[in-house]
């Protein structure tokens, strides 16, 4: 989906989320606490949310929310992001993508 690729590549950190998902809330809070200002797309609030969710599933994202892209690259869902954070790889990745300066 061309629109999805554009959404992913426009910002250094992009999160696809749903307001009703507790793991989405956890991931958004983590990035905000780290000082990152991610672009967040709430799939249950935007008109093409189901279409975007289907496109994420075709990329192999399961579950389809939350899904995080850093520097235009798929990082994955909550498990992958938390693993990167716990092994101290997330912050360097964010710095390389220009999402963090400190």
Swiss-Prot record:
Domain spans labelled Glutaredoxin: 1-101
GO MF: 2 iron, 2 sulfur cluster binding; metal ion binding
Domain of life: Eukaryota
UniProt cross-references to SUPFAM superfamilies, sorted A to Z: Thioredoxin-like (SSF52833)
Primary localization class, coarse: cytoplasm
Position of sequence motif Responsive for interaction with TGA factors: 99-102
Binding residues annotated for [2Fe-2S] cluster, in chain numbering: 21
Subcellular location: Cytoplasm; Nucleus
Key words, A-Z: 2Fe-2S, Cytoplasm, Iron, Iron-sulfur, Metal-binding, Nucleus, Redox-active center
Any single Pfam family the record assigns to this protein: Glutaredoxin
PROSITE patterns: GLUTAREDOXIN_2
Biological processes per GO annotation: response to nitrate
GO cellular component: cytoplasm; nucleus
CDD domains: GRX_GRXh_1_2_like
Function recorded in the entry: May only reduce GSH-thiol disulfides, but not protein disulfides.
Family recorded in the similarity comment: Belongs to the glutaredoxin family. CC-type subfamily.
Record protein name field: Monothiol glutaredoxin-S3
Gene expressing this chain: GRXS3
């Amino acid at each position: 989906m061309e629109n999805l690729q554009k959404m992913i590549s426009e910002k250094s950190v992009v999160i696809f989320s749903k307001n009703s998902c507790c793991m989405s809330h956890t991931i958004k809070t983590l990035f905000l606490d780290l000082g990152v200002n991610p672009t967040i797309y709430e799939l249950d609030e935007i008109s093409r949310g189901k279409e975007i969710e289907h496109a994420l599933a075709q990329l192999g994202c399961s579950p389809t929310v939350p899904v995080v892209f850093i520097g235009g690259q798929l990082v994955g869902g909550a498990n992958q992001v938390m693993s990167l954070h716990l092994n101290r790889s997330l912050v360097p990745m964010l710095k390389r993508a220009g999402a963090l300066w400190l």
